[in-house]
Amino acid sequence: MMSINLNLIMAFLLALAGVLIYRSHLMSTLLCLEGMMLSLFILMALLISHFHMFSASMAPLILLVFSACEAGVGLALLVKTSSNYGNDYVQNLNLLQC
């Protein structure tokens, strides 16, 4: 169980490093954020089942719902910036004025 937790924490840290390194393109940032959310979901589900905390069994599902909402908003931003500017650079996001 300890090696699985270590692998999931390393996956989260690698996705976080991906967000920090590849932050020029929006698509790369969104993929890294999805990797972070997926590793958090699996880690949370494994820890809840390992420690038999079934009162908190809805927490991974709530995290998954927020992850889906984040993906939807991120893809909407990606479509908006790529249709307006023709690329997916993050630096174009502060040019969007609503």
UniProtKB/Swiss-Prot annotation:
<dbReference type="GO" id="GO:0045271">
    <property type="term" value="C:respiratory chain complex I"/>
</dbReference>
<comment type="similarity">
    <text>Belongs to the complex I subunit 4L family.</text>
</comment>
<protein>
    <recommendedName>
        <fullName>NADH-ubiquinone oxidoreductase chain 4L</fullName>
        <ecNumber>7.1.1.2</ecNumber>
    </recommendedName>
</protein>
<keyword id="KW-0472">Membrane</keyword>
<dbReference type="InterPro" id="IPR001133">
    <property type="entry name" value="NADH_UbQ_OxRdtase_chain4L/K"/>
</dbReference>
<dbReference type="Pfam" id="PF00420">
    <property type="entry name" value="Oxidored_q2"/>
</dbReference>
<dbReference type="GO" id="GO:0008137">
    <property type="term" value="F:NADH dehydrogenase (ubiquinone) activity"/>
</dbReference>
<feature type="transmembrane region" description="Helical">
    <location>
        <begin position="28"/>
        <end position="48"/>
    </location>
</feature>
<feature type="transmembrane region" description="Helical">
    <location>
        <begin position="59"/>
        <end position="79"/>
    </location>
</feature>
<keyword id="KW-0679">Respiratory chain</keyword>
<comment type="function">
    <text>Core subunit of the mitochondrial membrane respiratory chain NADH dehydrogenase (Complex I) which catalyzes electron transfer from NADH through the respiratory chain, using ubiquinone as an electron acceptor. Part of the enzyme membrane arm which is embedded in the lipid bilayer and involved in proton translocation.</text>
</comment>
<keyword id="KW-0813">Transport</keyword>
<dbReference type="GO" id="GO:0042773">
    <property type="term" value="P:ATP synthesis coupled electron transport"/>
</dbReference>
<dbReference type="InterPro" id="IPR039428">
    <property type="entry name" value="NUOK/Mnh_C1-like"/>
</dbReference>
<keyword id="KW-0812">Transmembrane</keyword>
<keyword id="KW-0496">Mitochondrion</keyword>
<dbReference type="GO" id="GO:0005743">
    <property type="term" value="C:mitochondrial inner membrane"/>
</dbReference>
<keyword id="KW-0999">Mitochondrion inner membrane</keyword>
<keyword id="KW-0249">Electron transport</keyword>
<comment type="subunit">
    <text>Core subunit of respiratory chain NADH dehydrogenase (Complex I) which is composed of 45 different subunits.</text>
</comment>
<keyword id="KW-1278">Translocase</keyword>
<keyword id="KW-0520">NAD</keyword>
<keyword id="KW-1133">Transmembrane helix</keyword>
<feature type="transmembrane region" description="Helical">
    <location>
        <begin position="1"/>
        <end position="21"/>
    </location>
</feature>
<keyword id="KW-0830">Ubiquinone</keyword>
